[in-house]
Amino acid sequence: MTVFLPILVCLCGGVGASCRYLLDVTIKTYWQRAFPLSTFTINLIAGFLAGLVAALALGGTLDEPWRLVLATGFLGGFSTFSTAINEMVTLFRKHRYPTAAAYLVLSLGVPVVAAACGFLV
C-alpha cells in the first residue's frame, strides 16, 4: 500500500470535498439565515470523525495508512475551516456582529468538543 498511499489520500480528499459540497448544497436549500449552518455542521461532523479516527488509531484498530487515508485524505477534503474564517469576515463586513461573534466562538469550540466526543465513543 506504500506506493499507492499518496494516490489514495488524494482520491479520498476528492471524495471528502465532494461530500462537503453535497452536504453544503443540501443544508443551504433548507437554511437561509445569516448564520452559516452548513459550514458549521460540516466542521462539527469532521471534528467528531477526526476524534473517532484518532481513537481507533490509538487503540490499534486502525493502521497508520488507513488513518492517513481517512484523516488527511477524506476529512482533509471534507472539513472546511478556511471557509468558516471567510464567512466570519463576511458577517463582520455586513455588520452582523452578534452573529459573527457567536459563529466565531461556536466554530472554534464545538468541533473540539465533537472531536473529544468522537474520541470517547
Swiss-Prot record:
GO terms for biological process: cellular detoxification of fluoride. GO terms for molecular function: fluoride channel activity; metal ion binding. InterPro entries: FluC. It catalyses: fluoride(in) = fluoride(out). The chain crosses the membrane at residues 3-23, 40-60, 69-89, 101-121. One of its GO terms (cellular component) is plasma membrane. Keywords: Cell membrane, Ion channel, Ion transport, Membrane, Metal-binding, Sodium, Transmembrane, Transmembrane helix, Transport. It holds the Pfam family CRCB. Its main location: membrane. The keyword Transmembrane applies. Na(+) is not transported, but it plays an essential structural role and its presence is essential for fluoride channel function. It is found in: Cell membrane. Na(+) binds at residues 76, 79. The keyword Transcription does not apply. It is a multi-pass membrane protein. Fluoride-specific ion channel. Important for reducing fluoride concentration in the cell, thus reducing its toxicity. HAMAP family: FluC. Belongs to the fluoride channel Fluc/FEX (TC 1.A.43) family. This is Fluoride-specific ion channel FluC 3.
